[in-house]
Amino acid sequence: MSKKLTFQEIILTLQQFWNDQGCMLMQAYDNEKGAGTMSPYTFLRAIGPEPWNAAYVEPSRRPADGRYGENPNRLYQHHQFQVVMKPSPSNIQELYLKSLELLGINPLEHDIRFVEDNWENPSTGSAGLGWEVWLDGMEITQFTYFQQVGGLQTGPVTSEVTYGLERLASYIQEVDSVYDIEWAPGVKYGEIFTQPEYEHSKYSFEISDQVMLLENFEKFEREAKRALEEGLVHPAYDYVLKCSHTFNLLDARGAVSVTERAGYIARIRNLARVVAKTFVAERKKLGFPLLDEETRIKLLAEED
């Protein structure tokens, strides 16, 4: 590798590359979530027949992974660069390798392996065929072909490419700690995120009000159901995300037993499934507007 890109240059390079492949550049969704997959730009758009190509950075919060800003590789919040393409291009893996080249990583000079790792998200009733991408022994990306999202079978097939930006930047810049990553010229990752990491870890493990969180989960669940009764998919899904993050805070705090944990996950999954079904029904009412006219007319005629 020659020039060592800053963190923000890595993002800009990936944005430009996937824009050139026909992806819309979306912005991070403004609700807490544990992974870019949970953004409505992936979760909702991966289901139903309409095409969808999007790329975006998604800050992802995982309270149980917080380490008070002291661990060089474990974080309360990390950043994913998410690419979703539906239908999946036949050359998606080749496109991915080309994106690495633009980041200064020559596939001919490095050990890049696709290691089978089928993906599942029990909280959203989602699963797919997947591979971890290992670069010289370190996982940097998750590749997934969705088979099921929100309990619904997917079709056409959606491919998802999730870059772990901190790991990728650590490799490109040859640093051992994420806090030493250069975010922008003269500004280190740690200068931005060490204090938030410490504070969120302290809150998640020591300070959070368990009673309040338990009450909030119940309230968010009720509100999601109320929104769904009115056919309001997006507000309902916002509350599903709030339920998920609240559960993650409870889990980090040790406030739920193993048995209770399974119950909470099932409750979130049930909500997500209703959201998914309602979304597809609403898109059908609209006539699946993102489909080309010929396919749209044919599909609607078949379904009628």
Curated annotation (Swiss-Prot):
Cystine bridges: none
UniProt key word Protein biosynthesis: yes
SUPFAM superfamilies linked to this entry: Class II aaRS and biotin synthetases
Top-level lineage group: Bacteria
Pfam families per the UniProt record, alphabetical: tRNA-synt_2e
Localization of this protein: Cytoplasm
Keyword hit for Nucleotide-binding: yes
InterPro entries: aa-tRNA-synth_II/BPL/LPL, Gly-tRNA-synth_heterodimer, Gly-tRNA_ligase_asu
Alphabetized UniProt keyword annotations: Aminoacyl-tRNA synthetase, ATP-binding, Cytoplasm, Ligase, Nucleotide-binding, Protein biosynthesis
GO BP, sorted A to Z: glycyl-tRNA aminoacylation
Gene3D superfamilies, per database record: Bira Bifunctional Protein, Domain 2, Class II aaRS and biotin synthetases, domain 2
Alphabetized GO MF terms: ATP binding; catalytic activity, acting on a protein; glycine-tRNA ligase activity; transferase activity
Subunit description: Tetramer of two alpha and two beta subunits.
Protein name: Glycine--tRNA ligase alpha subunit
Organism: Streptococcus agalactiae serotype V (strain ATCC BAA-611 / 2603 V/R)
Gene name, Swiss-Prot/TrEMBL: glyQ
